[in-house]
Regions:
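Catalytic PLP-binding core of fold-type I/II PLP enzymes
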Residues: 265-278, 282
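Short helix-capping segments at alpha-helix termini
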Residues: 81-86, 184-188, 236, 270-275, ...
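Phosphate/pyrophosphate-binding betaalpha-module
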Residues: 183-193, 224-237
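Preference for extracellular/luminal or secreted protein segments
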Residues: 1-53, 270-271, 291-381
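Extracellular glycoside hydrolase catalytic/binding regions
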Residues: 214-226
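Enzymes and membrane/adaptor proteins characterized by extended Gly/Ser/Thr/Asp/Glu-rich
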Residues: 52-176, 195, 200-215, 243-259, ...
Length: 381
């Protein structure tokens, strides 16, 4: 009996304390809503100070953080040391033109084909394997989240998304994206799917300043673009990224989806019953940063139901701005509480068992890609 009591006490004492918003200040809760970035390759005093004072919930890796394999792993290890063990550390790794892991110079990641090639092959087992490779290599550097897969549907020849999309056929997108998703999460990596509610039909790139329009009715959107999101919501996806395109036939204005309560709250939350974390595409992208004030972006997005922001321009500045808006009544503090709780709950679920594995750039994975996608052999030699 004494032994059982001792073991129970030992396990309780050694279990890492879970995060909770109960003892967080307003500023700390706002900090959870930020996914920050620093273009450096080692965690310096300025970053340490920012992590400890502002307590951001996430960090997005850029090419500047991914210089060499060992330095990258050390950088991410230090992020956890100063930002919290289960800080959300995410990286863009779609394949094709968007794969940050290939920036690592001294140890080459497996080069992933673009989504269009994956859709053209349309082999579910291959798509799962690709997701598995992505998840394994993301976890190998120590990160725990990836912006993949892309769920947008459209013709690559006319869409601003190009070959980042799997197909213009919704069924091909659904089946292959679902397998990529499963391969990623089977490595204990969070899959952040994008770009809700679908930007495949826009010809304007939201990175630029021009307003990006999708001229679809809700019925048209529901029958096509929303179907991959519905599929993955039913499969338990934990994070959905909302894009910056506008849907005037649905919202009756040109407000970007990322700032629209109709898109985020009415459709994603209430209609589709998504209960995870809602993230929006980077706040420094031209479509919103050049057309809305910084204050308007955060106030409108939070009031719409957005939980997390990528690439804020200075953590303290943004926390100050949001805190002031809460205190003035422009943002209900309950919206902050809801966001912080969703993010904290996600962080508490993150598993560390596969993190920092040694399965980065394995020759067997590169050979697999070569066998299935011959044009990509040159990158995987």
């Amino acid at each position: 009996m004494c032994l059982i009591v001792f073991i129970t006490i030992f396990l309780l004492c050694n279990k890492e304390k879970e995060l909770s918003i109960d003892n967080m200040s307003l500023r700390e809760k706002i900090g959870q809503m930020l996914m920050v970035y620093y273009n450096i390759d080692e965690v310096d005093e300025d970053l340490i100070k920012s992590l400890e004072e502002n307590k951001p919930g996430g960090f997005i890796l850029t090419g500047a953080n991914l210089i060499s394999y060992d330095r990258t792993r050390k950088f991410i290890s230090d992020l956890y040391k100063y930002g919290g063990k289960n800080m959300i550390v995410a990286v863009d790794q779609e394949g094709g033109s968007v794969q940050r892991l290939y920036d690592i110079k001294d140890k080459k990641a497996t080069f992933i084909p673009n989504a269009y090639e994956i859709g053209k092959l349309n082999d579910k087992s291959v798509s799962y394997k690709i997701g598995n490779i992505i998840g394994t290599e993301v976890s190998s550097i120590g990160a725990n989240a990836v912006f993949s897969p892309v769920l947008d549907i459209g013709d690559y020849k006319t869409s601003a998304m190009g070959k980042r999309m799997i197909s213009d056929d919704k069924d091909i997108v659904i089946s292959n994206a679902s397998e990529i998703y499963k391969g990623i999460i089977d490595n204990d990596v969070i899959s952040i799917v994008k770009h809700f509610p679908g930007i495949g039909d826009t010809v304007d790139d939201t990175h630029d300043s021009k307003v990006s329009i999708v001229n679809k009715t809700y019925e048209e959107l529901y029958n096509t673009d929303l179907q991959p999101f519905i599929k993955l919501i039913n499969e338990g996806v934990e994070v959905i990224m909302v894009g910056h395109s506008s849907y005037p036939k649905i919202t009756n204005d040109n407000l970007p989806a990322s700032l629209s309560s109709i898109i985020v709250n009415d459709i994603l939350r209430n209609e589709l019953k998504f209960d995870g974390v809602v993230m929006i595409d980077a706040v420094n992208m031209g479509t919103i940063s050049n057309n809305y004030s910084e204050k308007d972006i955060y106030v409108k997005a939070i009031n719409a139901g957005v939980n997390m922001f990528i690439m804020p321009n200075g953590s303290k500045r943004v926390i100050d701005l949001i805190e002031k808006a809460v205190k003035s009544g422009e943002i209900d503090e309950k919206m902050i509480d809801d966001s912080a709780k969703r993010i904290v709950d996600l962080r508490n679920k993150i598993s560390n068992k596969n993190k920092f594995n040694n399965n980065f750039g394995l020759s067997i994975n590169k050979k697999f890609i070569c066998e299935k996608f011959h044009d990509y052999c040159i990158y995987n030699e």
